[in-house]
Curated annotation (Swiss-Prot):
Subcellular location: Cell membrane
Pathway the protein takes part in: Phospholipid metabolism; phosphatidylethanolamine biosynthesis; phosphatidylethanolamine from CDP-diacylglycerol: step 2/2
Keywords, comma-separated and alphabetical: Cell membrane, Decarboxylase, Lipid biosynthesis, Lipid metabolism, Lyase, Membrane, Phospholipid biosynthesis, Phospholipid metabolism, Pyruvate, Zymogen
The name this protein goes by in its record: Phosphatidylserine decarboxylase proenzyme
Main function: Catalyzes the formation of phosphatidylethanolamine (PtdEtn) from phosphatidylserine (PtdSer).
Sites bearing Pyruvic acid (Ser), chain numbering: S253
Complex and partners: Heterodimer of a large membrane-associated beta subunit and a small pyruvoyl-containing alpha subunit.
Location, primary (coarse class): membrane
Catalytic activity: a 1,2-diacyl-sn-glycero-3-phospho-L-serine + H(+) = a 1,2-diacyl-sn-glycero-3-phosphoethanolamine + CO2
Cofactor(s) demanded: pyruvate
Length: 291
């Protein structure tokens, strides 16, 4: 790591992560014209935001910064390219951080850093065993990206697990410098049952992420500092189609997907750093090693 990256990571430990995120959340929800306009204009200039694909193309028409940040795209902006029945779709616009095999119960984060399924899934060993020796993919959403998360594959929601934690920034520097980054940051674990077996879609929070929303329960973070499990099989089943919206980040972050052993095969051209677009083909299910 460079000296600059080391200093950046050290600063992450010193900053009051949750207090800063709450403050940003207040500003991001503000409807005061000069506040929301100032933040939107600064953000657009800093990150080169293009609104031509958005349903609302005039930045002045967004009521809050959050509305701007979680803007919807035009219906034809992201066609479903993962159109074959076994195709797995990218859940978001962004860059592949890592992807590949889960070694026993260890998920690769960066050189010299792994984290466990048990920790990632909030301390549930039975749930972790469903993905032992499976496949994973991690997609990082940069500030300029579209920040809604969509379904990689059609499934029925089994449960969600809100796991409290830190709010480290998520980028290459922290992936290389913060052990267990994705298993220590605040996150929402969504478990779906699909025709190919269980699938986990995990929305990982980060510095100044003021919350995570889902289409089935609204805003789910922040919550009390304990794991909160919600069983969705006891109520009316919630089924979401491949490519359908699942949730959104109120600022930043990362999506981690988990698939069972012998089920998922990623596109051979994908590697760390590859750019992906929501509903694009990430890979496909295969039954080559079906047990």
């Amino acid at each position: 790591m460079s000296l600059r990256d080391k200093l950046f990571v050290t600063l992450q430990y010193l900053i009051p992560q949750h207090a800063l995120s709450r403050l940003v959340g207040i500003l991001a929800r503000s409807e005061v014209p000069w506040i929301k306009t100032t933040f939107i204009n600064m953000f657009m200039k800093r990150f080169g935001i293009d609104l031509s694909e958005a349903q609302i193309e005039d930045a002045d028409q967004f009521p809050t910064f959050n509305a701007f940040f979680t803007r919807a795209l035009k219906a034809d902006a992201r066609p479903l390219e993962a159109s074959e029945s076994n195709d797995i779709a990218s859940p978001a616009d962004g860059a592949v951080s890592q992807l590949g095999a889960i070694r026993a119960n260890q998920v690769f984060q960066a050189k010299g850093h792994d984290y466990s399924l048990y920790d990632l899934l909030g301390g549930d060993s039975a749930l972790a065993s469903e993905f032992t020796n499976g496949q994973f993919a991690t997609v990082y959403l940069s500030p300029r990206d579209y920040h809604r998360v969509h379904m990689p594959f059609t499934g029925t929601l089994r449960e969600t697990r809100y796991v409290p934690g830190d709010l480290f920034s998520v980028n290459e520097a922290t992936a290389n410098g913060v052990p267990n980054l994705f298993a220590r940051n605040e996150r929402l674990v969504c478990i779906f049952d699909t025709e190919q077996g269980p699938m986990a879609v995990i929305l990982v929070g980060a510095m100044i992420v003021a919350g995570i929303e889902t289409v089935f329960s609204g805003q789910v973070t922040p919550l009390p500092k304990q794991v909160v499990t919600t069983d969705y099989l006891r109520s009316k089943p919630i089924a979401l189609e491949k490519g359908e919206e699942l949730g959104r980040f109120l600022l930043g972050s990362t999506v981690v997907m988990l698939f069972p052993e012998g089920k998922a095969k990623f596109a051979p051209n994908l590697k760390p750093g590859s750019q992906v677009r929501v509903r694009g083909k990430l890979g496909a299910y295969t039954n080559e090693n079906k047990h």
